[in-house]
Structure formats: C-alpha cells, structure tokens
C-alpha cells in the first residue's frame, strides 16, 4: 500500500531546495494604467487599473499593432507619474529619445535606464543580478521598479 501524500512535507522540501523561492499568493497592490480604459479592463478587470506591478505581463500582436506605443509610451509614462523607476530594455534598437520625449516620457537617468540588448541570456543575467541586489536591500528601502522589454520576440 502506498503512503498517503503529505502536501506539507512536499511544500517544505520544495521551498528549502530552491534558494529564494517562496510559496503562497502575491496579489498585486499597485497597478499601472495602459492609457486605454478598454485595455485596462481586459488586462485587470478594472477600467482604472491596467498592468499589475510585480507580475509579468506580455503584450503580443502583429508588427505595427502599437505594442511599443502602449508599453514604451503609455505604461512607462504612467509608471513614472507614480514615482516608479523604469528599466527599458530595447532589443530592436528602435526606441529613440526624441520619440520617447514626444510621448512625454522622462528619459533622465533618475527616472529611466535604457539598455540595448540583443541576447536573451544578457537580459536574464541583467534581471537576475538586479533581483539579487534588490533582495539584499532592506524591504522598506526597495524602490518600485518596472522592467519593459521591447521586443521579447527579437530575443528568442
């Protein structure tokens, strides 16, 4: 006869085996508007919320559909308006400063870090390094940070 499955023991073993892993739910408390009420509703179920901070959100669509405009323009601007620092990773080398300024994005070093990367491994290493440093900070000293990758498809 097989032993009964013990979820408590399984959970304990699993969370101890992977450094930095946590269990449970992490419901978002902060939201960044997409600049479009209908899209906010589709993403979050609320006309005023939009993209949840602390979660991965992917915008996919045909070339020219407006993904860069929504993400690099509207969402970055809304994040900055909320005091959130933005790391903008540009894999197409297509996001120029004049275009971002036209969208009212603040490109100063205190508000935005724009990185040009063409390899997914570089992006993974950058985010991994950031997360290690971020977790080492005292929780009340951690700034709110938004990562935007334009375009993920070019990295794959």
Residue ranges and their predicted role:
Residues 118-156:
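Phosphate-binding/switch loop-helix module in NTP-utilizing enzymes
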Residues 2-110, 122-132:
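The Walker A/P-loop phosphate-binding site
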Residues 110-118:
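Short acidic-hydrophobic, aromatic-tinged amphipathic segments that line or gate anion-handling sites
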Residues 88, 115, 151:
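Small/polar loops that bind or transfer phosphate-bearing groups
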């Amino acid at each position: 006869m097989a032993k009964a499955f013990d979820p408590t023991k399984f959970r304990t073993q699993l969370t101890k085996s992977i450094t930095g892993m946590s269990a449970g739910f992490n419901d978002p408390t902060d939201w960044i508007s997409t600049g479009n009420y209908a899209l906010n509703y589709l993403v979050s179920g609320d006309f005023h919320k939009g993209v949840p901070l602390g979660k991965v959100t992917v915008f996919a669509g045909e070339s020219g559909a407006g993904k860069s405009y929504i993400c690099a323009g509207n969402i970055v601007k809304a994040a900055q308006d909320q005091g959130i620092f933005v790391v903008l990773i540009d894999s197409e080398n297509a996001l120029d400063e004049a275009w971002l300024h036209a969208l009212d994005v603040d490109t100063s070093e205190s508000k935005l870090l724009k990185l040009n990367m063409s390899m997914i491994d570089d992006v993974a290493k950058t985010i991994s390094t950031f997360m290690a440093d971020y977790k080492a900070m005292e929780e009340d000293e951690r700034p709110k940070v938004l990562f935007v990758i334009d375009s993920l498809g070019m990295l794959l």
